[in-house]
């Protein structure tokens, strides 16, 4: 009996389903794994919209009693089965599993079992897709089911489906932008003069930042998303752990003042570009020219600029954080699977990664002012082949703790780091110098 049911289900999945409004067709049965902010928002979207061909039949949550009695559970159909036993769902006749729990284990194992049993998967799990996406996609293709992950990057911004469907005819050469709403909220608030600690506390209170914010502020969240986008846009399989990251926590309010003098602001930028067999990839705070659209992305807004060889730049922008925007992306993927859309399998090659970009650099020093300091800095930079472009010093600071900024002409970060290593030994240096790359509108990291 089980074999017959499973065979019938697999047959149905290989054919496009009629439009959701045709009641004569059996409903597509859906299970939710996780009922947190995004999971409950997905249930609300399904309940508040007319999707008669979609039936939410199962919900997995580790604390069923608490969730069932919560106000957000009112959007769940009374007939839905709540369970804390994953096998109830894996052994059911569910057609599509929506995974919203996050992390690698035990989720990867559960989804592999779901795929093998003939269930399609929709997920917003960026870590899973960044680290295990290629293997899961291959497994899904082998079992004639689908794996959709449009909500894994930029929440409600359709950057993944946009690249898969709208840009697949172009040859994408570069992508850059903002894919972490938490960091964008923090940095755009600091732009108005607020300090990092205060804004971080506000972000945590608003639910934008976790109690441990390191995944966001140190760039790990954005790194996973950059790897996903690189696989789709650049056809490059990257090891996330090999992608260079830099924290935003060392950026201070004064840096925004200096950035303004340079007609720039500061944002956490994720960027990647193919150069032969290499991919230049990096996540970190950068000075962004005010002439770039990325500079005008505020709050939790995400923005990704995709540069194509033939079509030029395409900008994707919208709210990336929050339950509702992400839920919209999840439900869009769900409907695509239910309507028989195929998940696109693009040719992907494993690529070596370098964090090197040829770019101008912003260097902020804090010193006990003494004669010869600027000369020493210029000498250290000249020794490694880096040329100074400008020197900025704001009035009103005491000489015993004097901040000032040096910007360089385009050079490699590794070159700058050599100079900073020697300068750090000087007694007059009161802090480790802050080094930020400066984004150029016509940036050409392929020359690195």
Language-model features: where?
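A conserved regulatory-domain signal marking ACT and ACT-like small-molecule sensing domains
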Residues: 33, 329-448
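Rossmann-like NAD(P)H-binding beta-loop-alpha module
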Residues: 141-144, 148-221, 228
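Rossmann-fold NAD(P) dinucleotide-binding segment
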Residues: 86-124
């Amino acid at each position: 009996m089980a074999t017959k049911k499973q065979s019938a289900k697999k047959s149905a999945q290989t054919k496009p389903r009629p439009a959701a409004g045709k009641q004569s067709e059996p409903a597509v049965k859906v299970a939710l794994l996780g009922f947190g902010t995004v999971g409950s928002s997905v249930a609300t979207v399904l309940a508040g919209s007319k999707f008669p061909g979609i039936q939410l039949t199962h919900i997995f949550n580790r604390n069923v009693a608490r969730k069932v009695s919560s106000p957000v559970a009112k959007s769940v159909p009374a007939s839905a089965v709540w369970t804390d036993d994953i096998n109830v769902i894996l052994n059911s006749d569910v057609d599509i599993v929506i995974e919203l729990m996050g992390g690698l284990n035990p989720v990867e194992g559960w989804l592999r079992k779901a795929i093998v049993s003939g269930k399609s998967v929709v997920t917003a799990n960026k870590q899973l897709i960044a680290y295990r996406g290629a293997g899961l996609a291959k497994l899904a293709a082998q079992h004639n089911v689908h794996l959709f992950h449009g909500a894994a990057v930029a929440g409600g911004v359709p950057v993944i489906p946009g690249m898969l469907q709208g840009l697949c005819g172009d040859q994408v050469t570069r992508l850059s932008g903002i894919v972490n709403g938490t960091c964008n909220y923090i940095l755009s608030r600091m732009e108005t003069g607020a300090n990092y600690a205060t804004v971080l506390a506000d972000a945590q209170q608003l639910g934008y930042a976790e109690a441990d914010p390191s995944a966001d502020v140190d760039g790990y969240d954005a790194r996973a998303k950059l790897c996903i986008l690189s696989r789709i846009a650049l056809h490059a399989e990257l090891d996330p752990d090999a992608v260079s990251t830099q924290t935003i926590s060392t950026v201070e309010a004064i840096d925004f003042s200096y950035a303004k003098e340079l007609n720039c602001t500061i944002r956490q930028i994720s960027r990647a570009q193919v150069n032969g067999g290499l991919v230049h990839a990096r996540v970190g705070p950068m000075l962004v020219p005010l002439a770039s659209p990325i500079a005008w992305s505020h709050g939790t807004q995400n923005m990704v600029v995709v540069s194509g060889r033939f079509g030029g730049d395409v900008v994707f922008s919208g709210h990336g954080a929050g339950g509702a925007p992400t839920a919209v992306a999840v439900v869009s993927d769900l409907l695509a699977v239910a309507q028989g859309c195929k998940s696109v399998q693009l040719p992907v090659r494993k690529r070596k990664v370098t964090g090197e970009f040829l770019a101008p650099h912003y260097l902020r020093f804090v010193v006990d002012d003494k004669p010869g300091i600027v000369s020493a800095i210029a000498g250290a930079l000249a020794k490694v082949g880096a040329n100074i472009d400008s020197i900025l010093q704001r009035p009103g600071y005491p000489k015993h703790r004097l901040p000032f900024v040096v910007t360089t002409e385009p050079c490699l970060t590794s070159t700058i780091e050599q100079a900073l290593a020697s300068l750090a030994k000087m007694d007059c240096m009161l802090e480790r110098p802050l080094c930020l790359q400066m984004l150029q509108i016509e940036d050409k990291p392929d020359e690195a």
